[in-house]
Regions:
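Short beta-strand His + acidic residue motifs that chelate non-heme Fe in jelly-roll/DSBH
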Residues: 43, 61-62, 78, 84-90
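Short acidic-glycine-tyrosine-enriched beta hairpin
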Residues: 66-81
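Short, conserved beta-strand element in jelly-roll/cupin
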Residues: 34-36, 46-61
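Short histidine-centered beta-strand/loop micro-motifs
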Residues: 20-22, 40-46, 87-89, 108-109
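A generic "binding-loop/recognition-motif" signal
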Residues: 47, 66, 82-83, 92, ...
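A short hydrophobic beta-strand segment most commonly corresponding to one strand
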Residues: 30, 77, 92-109
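A short, N-terminal "cap"/entry segment at the start of jelly-roll beta-barrel domains
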Residues: 1-28, 109-110
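Conserved short histidine dyad/triad with adjacent acidic residue
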Residues: 15, 30-46
Length: 110
């Protein structure tokens, strides 16, 4: 068992980053995104699936050219290779847990 405190994780951009291979020798990486309104990553893709659990706030997602609005309680499953981006919308932060099915974070920015 590994115990990692959130405050000990690197904070990059708008996310605490738990990279499985570095923090617990495990096959997944998890990011806690805490984005202010208007923030979010531009178009990118990963060579593995990603599952996003929306905890608070609202956002707009674009996946392979289709746009979706979502909020607390929604789950997005983004398949390997799908081009996607999202940004927080509204007046409150967007908080989500992003599970990357890979021990290492791999992202191609487009």
């Amino acid at each position: 068992m590994h115990h990692v405190r959130q405050e000990n994780l690197p904070f990059v951009g708008s996310s605490h980053e738990f990279v499985g291979a570095e923090h617990a020798d495990t096959g997944v990486s998890v990011f806690l995104f805490h984005g202010k309104p208007g923030s979010g990553p531009g178009p990118h893709r990963h060579p593995y699936d990603e599952i996003q659990f929306i905890l608070e706030g609202r956002g707009m997602w674009t996946v392979n050219g289709q746009t979706f609005e979502g909020g607390a309680g929604d789950i997005f499953v983004i398949k390997a290779g799908e081009i996607h981006s999202f940004k927080a919308v509204g007046d409150s932060p967007l908080i989500q847990v992003d599970v990357h099915l890979s021990p290492r974070f791999i992202q191609e920015n487009l």
